[in-house]
Amino acid sequence: MIIELAKNYGFCFGVKRAIKKAEQIKDAATIGPLIHNNEEISRLQKNFNVKTLENIQALSNEKKAIIRTHGITKQDLEELRKKDIEIFDATCPFVTKPQQICEQMSKEGYEVVIFGDENHPEVKGVKSYVSTKAYVVLDKKELQNIKLPNKIAVVSQTTKKPEHFMEIVNFLILKTKEVRVFNTICDATFKNQDAIKELSLKSDVMVVVGGKNSANTKQLFLIAKTNCEDSYLIETEEELKKEWFLDKKHCGISAGASTPDWIIQKVIAKIENFRIN
């Protein structure tokens, strides 16, 4: 059986930057998980004493706080700055961009449509920078019964599929007089999604490695599953089952943006140890 890695996979720029920052700072607390990968979070806690707090209210005697890659709300940032604590911002620049856009567009009188999951920390943070009105949607149908203003700005959660974002944009263009469209989908998302699409079309089994609470990993899995029925989403090599690979000829592997290479290599090694001819 051939084992092939996607052309683009794993750690993105923002995650690499955050991990490096956490390793250098040490002995700190993150507000929410730094990234959506439980194994890497555990490694940072064990080796660098970087612990994860649920929210700002959980801070007690910590001297250093790291803002997660997904960012935090504007209100939480203001609250954090009032505390006697050193702040290190690990928000991904691709996430900071829609925050800034929302703030500026609001000042110019635009209401904002955010394409994304309203429960995702990134989207909560982005929405908090809107001072007019924000509409968080996952489908154009959610906009059909809303009385839209004449001026709308549109941004996307960084990990969404571009074609779905365009469905929202095309709907709005027909419904309102002025639409400002900002492509806030991350470059790494484009590349990883294109790569897994290509690989899954020629594979008869696919393994996607990453946190099951990771939005970008779940998107990769959905793309793989669309093209390859026998697709599996795992967090560690312990979840692999030999029967997945029996009678298979081509195994494709991809990984979410928060998945470190050391986990991916363990997955590959275990599949190789199954010795599937």
Swiss-Prot record:
CDD domains: lytB_ispH (cd13944). Pathway: Isoprenoid biosynthesis; dimethylallyl diphosphate biosynthesis; dimethylallyl diphosphate from (2E)-4-hydroxy-3-methylbutenyl diphosphate: step 1/1; Isoprenoid biosynthesis; isopentenyl diphosphate biosynthesis via DXP pathway; isopentenyl diphosphate from 1-deoxy-D-xylulose 5-phosphate: step 6/6. It comes from the Bacteria. Dimethylallyl diphosphate binds at H36, H70, H120, S214, N216, S258. The active site is at E122 (proton donor). It catalyses: isopentenyl diphosphate + 2 oxidized [2Fe-2S]-[ferredoxin] + H2O = (2E)-4-hydroxy-3-methylbut-2-enyl diphosphate + 2 reduced [2Fe-2S]-[ferredoxin] + 2 H(+); dimethylallyl diphosphate + 2 oxidized [2Fe-2S]-[ferredoxin] + H2O = (2E)-4-hydroxy-3-methylbut-2-enyl diphosphate + 2 reduced [2Fe-2S]-[ferredoxin] + 2 H(+). Pfam families: LYTB. [4Fe-4S] cluster binds at C12, C92, C186. InterPro entries: LytB/IspH. Gene3D superfamilies: 3.40.50.11270, 4-hydroxy-3-methylbut-2-enyl diphosphate reductase, catalytic domain. GO terms for molecular function: 4 iron, 4 sulfur cluster binding; 4-hydroxy-3-methylbut-2-enyl diphosphate reductase activity; metal ion binding. Belongs to the IspH family. This is 4-hydroxy-3-methylbut-2-enyl diphosphate reductase. The lineage of its organism: Bacteria, Pseudomonadati, Campylobacterota, Epsilonproteobacteria, Campylobacterales.
